[in-house]
């Protein structure tokens, strides 16, 4: 049931992204970034001895949502710079630099809200500790993916499309 729900969630996310972004390349970039972020989160969870349960799945969902938000902000900034006449690589660097502060600030703010839950005592602390750690790991992973992986994917995927359309090589 979890597997089919995850697949359905990914399909719905991709369809909604395509409807609103209206560009196949950017939809593909975000679609590739989501599993990268989730795998990075799984690694952090593994090394901190967290298991996959309903609480940690909720944390993963929140982190994936924040990744999509951050990714769209970064992609739109890169796209806007590319429309100004910059090369794809220049647009990726400039666009990411322009919004990096805002993306980092919004992600860290959400982390600061969830991380103190780790220090709760009693039953509520035991209940929500795994979720708080998972949200934190997921948000940290999504931040790195949005700042480092998204610009690289944008350069590679849209650069490949441009070269295929007669744009030449770099």
What residues fall within each predicted segment?
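Hydrophobic regular secondary-structure detector
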Residues: 1-170
């Amino acid at each position: 049931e979890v597997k089919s729900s995850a697949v359905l969630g990914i399909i719905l996310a991709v369809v909604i992204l395509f409807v609103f972004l209206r560009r196949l390349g950017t939809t593909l970039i975000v679609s590739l970034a989501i599993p990268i972020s989730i795998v990075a989160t799984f690694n952090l969870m593994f090394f901190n001895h967290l298991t996959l349960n309903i609480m940690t799945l909720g944390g993963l969902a929140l982190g994936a949502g924040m990744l999509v938000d951050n990714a769209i902000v970064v992609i739109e900034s890169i796209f806007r710079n590319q429309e100004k006449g910059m090369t794809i690589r220049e647009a990726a660097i400039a666009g990411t630099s322009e919004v990096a502060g805002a993306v980092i600030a919004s992600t860290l703010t959400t982390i600061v809200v969830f991380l103190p839950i780790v220090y709760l005592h009693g039953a509520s602390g035991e209940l929500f500790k795994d979720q708080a750690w998972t949200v934190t790991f997921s948000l940290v992973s999504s931040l790195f993916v949005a700042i480092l992986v998204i610009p690289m994917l944008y350069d590679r995927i849209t650069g490949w499309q441009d070269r295929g359309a007669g744009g030449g090589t770099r």
